[in-house]
């Protein structure tokens, strides 16, 4: 409501005051909008504050400067702060939709083309999974007072829209003590008593007061005026609420009314002429009032028309927005039919979770697989197994399907199927809780027990248990496909009863057994051949996996590589394998899924075997050489065991348990600390956890985490890996410690225990990787600097291959080459010198206790980033700026987590498919071998990315034009169909030749790294 402060009461009745009222000016609302960002959701995390300007503010990567998430585009959103009315609106600009969180309201998904008004204390998440920032809006509650002429007009900010749009203003008088509201009413004088009566009635309807022109009717007029005043007050209140009324202008006061009376102040009657003149004046005044009322009515009609037009426009905009949303939904549905979305599931409160997180007590980690991580917990005094499902395997559109699956899992009851107990939201991830079996997985039993400790009868009984459990799942309604059947997903109790587990991510097929599903959740060695060619999953896929499990139980071995691609299509069988077992394995692993038996048929054969064994009293234990030619009494130095204790140097403490080799070791411990492996090659590089300070988590993934910290005053990069380290991996780290080259990230040390270990490496800086360079700065690439980068990349791999022993990278991608520059190295050295000065005392103490440990320095004076993962470079991608001169970039190769040495003892591990499938050489699928020429194939794919980006100024993923259900299917196309990336027609012939030679199907024909470097130098000479 507006209030009027009188500056001069004597001039209240002058007509100028009424005319000036429409010209009152309003001062804008002063609005201050600040955004508050937190790096982490915990309460102790520091807060970054960013104040918005009046007008348009772009929010995106680099705006504000500390916002550097790669998932946020540079023009992700726009926030507009209005200077006139103080409104704050949010417009979505980027592809990743933002989400608005408001108290007591459901989250609002921001879409492009729709503006959303922001309120104080709103929270906005710029994409799914990001930490939301808060919005704080401060406004002046009222307009500033403006004194104009004879009065001061003050308006509340809440009435802004009404007073701006209304043709007139609501006016009230104020006093120094209390503010009272009186309606100022126009006075219309009539010519005669009859007119007085009619006018009184009319004025009552129009909220106006009439004064009579004789003394006899003065009292009545006064009463009418009072009544009309009351009516006006009520009407004014209603008008203020509806914001639609036309308010009367201020008119003459009672002083003018006295001048309009027919009797002079000295009580002398007027003459007829004077009365006639006075009547004429009154008629003229009445006409003016009527004209004014007509104009006011026209203004009201125009205002209503304007409001109707605005409403009509808003309705049209809403209809257009709805049409756009419908089109977007249709496009999304069409897109989902061709390609599955990889967006994580949002676990909502509506999911029926029956176990609370605070009811679970963590005991230990059991392991991790393709579909999730398994840990042992205690729930209400009972040991349970909890599987946390990887977010990347769940999608937003699968919520209803998951709830349906959970409802069916609760109904499963079979002695050979693990009991499903419920679901839980654990650390923000969805978890499935099942019963816990003491002996662990079948793989644990086969690894920890000697072959002679399990009789043939017990092994067949275990196979019958597996077949019975799988037959129950396949004959359930609807049928349940496991998709990841292997020894790790079969649990064993104390009596060697086996139960099928880890089918929490299996999907239900509604069309019967003939239907198939295409959700990949398997492990390579157990995958049936039809899955590779895109045929999808049927129940016969589980039968193939069971054939591999049958081979595991008989041999105690663990399969490696893609068995289905071998000439046999199944693992190699021992020469003395019983014929009945050999036949069953071949039937289950038949390349034609239609010729494989179902589990009902498998059960009949297994029970027949079991009865024959018992009837013949053939309970002899399997001889240790029945399925192996290996000697159990091997020396420690030749051991390839992944679980035992291997000690080649002096070790303090007591070693408990028996030390064996060839996968026959028990879970032995050192000082009760679990499996411990200490080699002479690595003991000087073992770092104690308390020597790493100022640790900061960069990113957390399913099987590892990337951190940064300080070691002896220098910034280091830390890759923390879930799972224990085995003797061969420890020996590998010992060789990596000897790498000292400006072309490779330097290994500093390792921190390890029984459950996990961490690799400590030098810190390269925040310049990102070759992949981020191509994605963000493709326009800066030319043939000169591109070929220079290609030469450096090739030289870094050449260094590894010429190392003694030769090192095969086996995980070459465009993201495993980090960027550094001389300028950045100098700045980092200065920072490290300061850190060294501040931590001299700590370093001295550490040196006294660790005289043999590496000092973590760099012979070249460089402090560079270790990193072994794609995620590390993604977090630093946004920090690549124009300050990094591409012509001065230095390449450092990293990510040796999958590297292997080209030695005879590593022959088996070299057969396993590692790394990114898009870069994997075809011989891994067809020949199951890996050599230095395999690295050259992967290197050629990286060079293809680099040269294509330079040529087209746009980065595209290899095989982007090929439609795949899963990335691993590309191996089938490159191996069986000889598919290769498409080279642009205008690519220089010299470059095309290098690429095509590098990815020859016959690895022997691929050029050496020396040849590639020579040809690149020739290309630079010709093209530059």
UniProtKB/Swiss-Prot annotation:
Residues at the catalytic site: 484
Compositional bias annotation for Low complexity: 190-244, 823-851, 862-874
EC number: 2.7.11.1
Regions crossing the membrane: none
Gene Ontology BP annotations: signal transduction
Residue spans of biased composition, Basic and acidic residues class: 250-261
Keyword Kinase among UniProt keywords: yes
Binding site for ATP: 366-374, 387, 651-659, 719
Matches recorded under SUPFAM superfamilies: Protein kinase-like (PK-like), SMAD/FHA domain
Catalytic activity: L-seryl-[protein] + ATP = O-phospho-L-seryl-[protein] + ADP + H(+); L-threonyl-[protein] + ATP = O-phospho-L-threonyl-[protein] + ADP + H(+)
GO molecular-function term, one example from the UniProt record: ATP binding
Residues of the Protein kinase domain: 360-609, 645-1018
The entry's keywords: ATP-binding, Kinase, Nucleotide-binding, Repeat, Serine/threonine-protein kinase, Transferase
Chain intervals for the UniProt region annotation (Disordered): 187-261, 823-874
InterPro entries: Kinase-like_dom_sf (IPR011009), Prot_kinase_dom (IPR000719), Ser-Thr/Tyr_kinase_cat_dom (IPR001245), Ser/Thr_kinase_AS (IPR008271), Ser/Thr_Kinases-Pseudokinases (IPR051681), SMAD_FHA_dom_sf (IPR008984)
Short name of any one Pfam family annotated for the protein: PK_Tyr_Ser-Thr
Protein name: Probable serine/threonine-protein kinase DDB_G0271682
Record organism: Dictyostelium discoideum (Social amoeba)
Biological classification of the source: Eukaryota, Amoebozoa, Evosea, Eumycetozoa, Dictyostelia
